[in-house]
Design a protein with these regions (language model features):
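Short S/T/G/P-rich N-terminal loop/turn motif that feeds into the first structured element of a domain
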Residues: 1-44, 50-60, 71-110
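A short, acidic, amphipathic alpha-helical segment used as a generic capping/interface helix at domain edges
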Residues: 63-67
């Protein structure tokens, strides 16, 4: 889960980037859900992937769009929820984004 704060006056431009994020991500077979929610200038990207490899492929896929987004918004929080073994694969590659890692230890997925 990724949270942004959009710079003043940039919400329209950020929403246009969100449309590009969605179009690009729709092509990824390992993405199981992906959507943006808005509360004023606060934006939440809810996303889920089959595994760590799919998440890393996503970051490669949307990297250029993310760089554009970071010119008009800041990441305020990044959470990664996954089984511990998957988190182990993500800690080093995601370190620069300073995520909070949560080990999933129960529940179900359909």
């Amino acid at each position: 889960m990724l949270y942004f704060k959009v710079n003043e006056g940039q919400l329209g431009a950020f929403k246009a980037l969100c449309e590009r994020f969605v179009a690009q991500t729709r092509k990824e077979p390992g993405c199981v859900h992906y959507a943006f929610s808005f509360d004023g200038d606060a934006v939440h990207c809810r996303e889920g992937y089959d595994n760590a490899a799919a998440l890393l492929a996503h970051l490669d896929n949307v990297g250029p769009i993310l760089q554009e987004a970071l010119k008009i918004a800041a990441i305020t929080r990044l959470e990664v929820h996954a089984p511990a073994a998957e988190l182990a694969e993500l800690r080093e590659p995601l370190a620069g984004l300073k995520p909070a890692f949560f080990a999933v230890e129960g529940g179900f997925r359909r």
